Amino acid sequence: MAVTNQMVAPRYAKALLEAAQDQNQVETVHEELQALQSVFNDNPTILTIFDNARITAADKDALMTTLTKDASPLVANLLKLTQQYGRFGALPAIISAFNQAYDEEAGIIAATVTTAVALSADQADALRSTIAARFGMKSTQLDQVVDPSVIGGVRIQARGSVIDGTVKHRFDKMKAALLAD
């Protein structure tokens, strides 16, 4: 069975987080990984260059030098290691897994909140507090989605859980109950 990027990403991320903690470099590594993610988002072809046989070794070395020039030793080693083992394309998944582990360590939960209208600052703050308390975390990173089709109420998605208190959801449940036997 082939090992996929999604399978190896948590292993690399965990090892990187532990090494960063040992060297008291967690914030530095986190910031550098966010910058790398931006580079990959802007230039997705970078992820395939090291697997491309038509690109010379000198060009690959030049790219690696550019990528690692301002990086901390931990991030530079991650880049070199993933390139060496043919896992450079896994870097977005590794960064995502690192971010999840980083948030977990920091007591931050990411949540997506869907409402019919935009939340006020006070409402968003109240939801952040409620979600953090519900999941036993310190704070909530809130992604707000406005979807008029929910009619009213709120749908919260966090850690694979969905708490749906929307009017549309209630209507759908009533409709299903009425149509049942």
From Swiss-Prot:
Pfam families: OSCP. Belongs to the ATPase delta chain family. It comes from the Bacteria. Gene3D superfamilies: N-terminal domain of the delta subunit of the F1F0-ATP synthase (1.10.520.20). It is a peripheral membrane protein. F(1)F(0) ATP synthase produces ATP from ADP in the presence of a proton or sodium gradient. F-type ATPases consist of two structural domains, F(1) containing the extramembraneous catalytic core and F(0) containing the membrane proton channel, linked together by a central stalk and a peripheral stalk. During catalysis, ATP synthesis in the catalytic domain of F(1) is coupled via a rotary mechanism of the central stalk subunits to proton translocation. This is ATP synthase subunit delta. The lineage of its organism: Bacteria, Bacillati, Bacillota, Bacilli, Lactobacillales. F-type ATPases have 2 components, F(1) - the catalytic core - and F(0) - the membrane proton channel. F(1) has five subunits: alpha(3), beta(3), gamma(1), delta(1), epsilon(1). F(0) has three main subunits: a(1), b(2) and c(10-14). The alpha and beta chains form an alternating ring which encloses part of the gamma chain. F(1) is attached to F(0) by a central stalk formed by the gamma and epsilon chains, while a peripheral stalk is formed by the delta and b chains. One of its GO terms (molecular function) is proton-transporting ATP synthase activity, rotational mechanism. It is found in: Cell membrane. Keywords: ATP synthesis, Cell membrane, CF(1), Hydrogen ion transport, Ion transport, Membrane, Transport. It comes from Lacticaseibacillus paracasei (strain ATCC 334 / BCRC 17002 / CCUG 31169 / CIP 107868 / KCTC 3260 / NRRL B-441). InterPro entries: ATP_synth_OSCP/delta_N_sf (IPR026015), ATPase_OSCP/dsu (IPR000711). GO terms for cellular component: plasma membrane; proton-transporting ATP synthase complex.
